[in-house]
Amino acid sequence: MTYFPHTPQEIKEMLNTIGLESIEDLFSEIPEEIRQKAKENFKIPASPSEIDLLEEIKNIARKNIGKDYISFLGGGAYKHYIPPFVKLVSLFPTFYTAYTPYQPEISQGVLQSIFEYQSLICDLTGMEVANASLYEAGSGIAEAALMSVRITGKKEVIASSGLNPEYISVLKTYLQAQNIELKIIPLDEKGETDVDFLEKNISPKTSGVIIQNPNFFGVIETKLKDIEELIHKNNALFILSIYPISLGILKPPSEYNVDIVVGEGQSLGIPLGFGGPYLGILATKKEFIRQIPGRIVGETIDLEGERGFVNTLQTREQHIRRAKATSNICTNEALSAISAAVYMAILGKKGIKKIAEVCFSRAHYLRERMQKEVNLEITYPNSHFFNEFVIKIPENSENFLKKLEEKKILGGIPLSRFYKDRDKEILVAVTERNSLEELEYYIKSLKEVLKKN
């Protein structure tokens, strides 16, 4: 297919065919005064040269904070190192396409890659089956909640307030339109899900309980086994939201008898991007395979006895009746899933464990220095954490962070963005990309900013 614009001759022939003299005649039904007003309001300047256009774009881009800034941002999207090989493979013409592999006879490479992604996610989480991907963690959590409703036949979902607030927002959007009740469970003094409060609010009417580990504040949930027993005692499903890299050192969800695992796959070789594309992970027990949203790539044997791969269990609304469909999830994040598969395959279990250990140790080193040398107060000081923690500062967090930006440091996320009453707290994340020199510079800059106050 070519993408050349129509020539004047072609335009003339098309107009002759429909009995018109000019393109303007196509809009004759719109009153002249409205068309004239539109022309005046939407004056498009003459197109610049390619050189001038590139310079203009560069000037606009300079308004952004550059890549040379030291970043301690997290909250669901993290700056991890991406091996060049991941991008190299992802840009293969076979993979770098928006085409959905509906024709298995010409799509074996893509289908096998997605199959490998599913297998690697199962290895990482310990679950029995994973789907071919979802959009991102927020919609993945909402889809998991809907799965629990379909499986149990009950219409009440409980979520911990340790869940990323943006995920909770997406969850509310999905559930309220279907008249599914959502209860939010608070955290205890250690920043973990309040198990006593959960016990008082869960009931036989509950379809599923959603916990995030580590939670939005970086805290590791240490009572997952107690939570699991409480959930299954009430015949509900246990839904766990994960940070994939943390599984390098934390127990896999399967060891807590989790029913559905969801998570954001951006940390698995996918670059940071405002608006994505990211990757929604969803894995579950085999008994729930027919309630999985989206699609699964399965392995089969063709007529010649050769191994092959096909899309299977596509219970989506464009394949079957909408009333019978498990989801209206359409195009998946296949390219992101392939990137994640390449990343996991390159690093292997030892590599992911090493990255997790570095994130863990450097985050603990930074927090300890902040406590002892900068005298910053730590929110949830007695909790266990992976690579994120919350600090308290003596002034408005957004103003404080702007002062750090002047030193080319993105110091963290102000919690006031999500919680109005927490305007003096900052969520700080550390990854393997943060060198010891950067940690030292952050400590030095904190001292200087606090000294000026």
Curated annotation (Swiss-Prot):
Catalytic activity: N(6)-[(R)-lipoyl]-L-lysyl-[glycine-cleavage complex H protein] + glycine + H(+) = N(6)-[(R)-S(8)-aminomethyldihydrolipoyl]-L-lysyl-[glycine-cleavage complex H protein] + CO2
EC numbers for this chain: 1.4.4.2
Gene Ontology MF terms in the entry: glycine dehydrogenase (decarboxylating) activity
Disulfide bond annotation, renumbered to this chain: none
Function in brief: The glycine cleavage system catalyzes the degradation of glycine. The P protein binds the alpha-amino group of glycine through its pyridoxal phosphate cofactor; CO(2) is released and the remaining methylamine moiety is then transferred to the lipoamide cofactor of the H protein.
Pfam families: GDC-P
SUPFAM superfamilies the UniProt entry points to: PLP-dependent transferases
Oxidoreductase is among the record's keywords: yes
Superkingdom: Bacteria
Protein name: Probable glycine dehydrogenase (decarboxylating) subunit 1
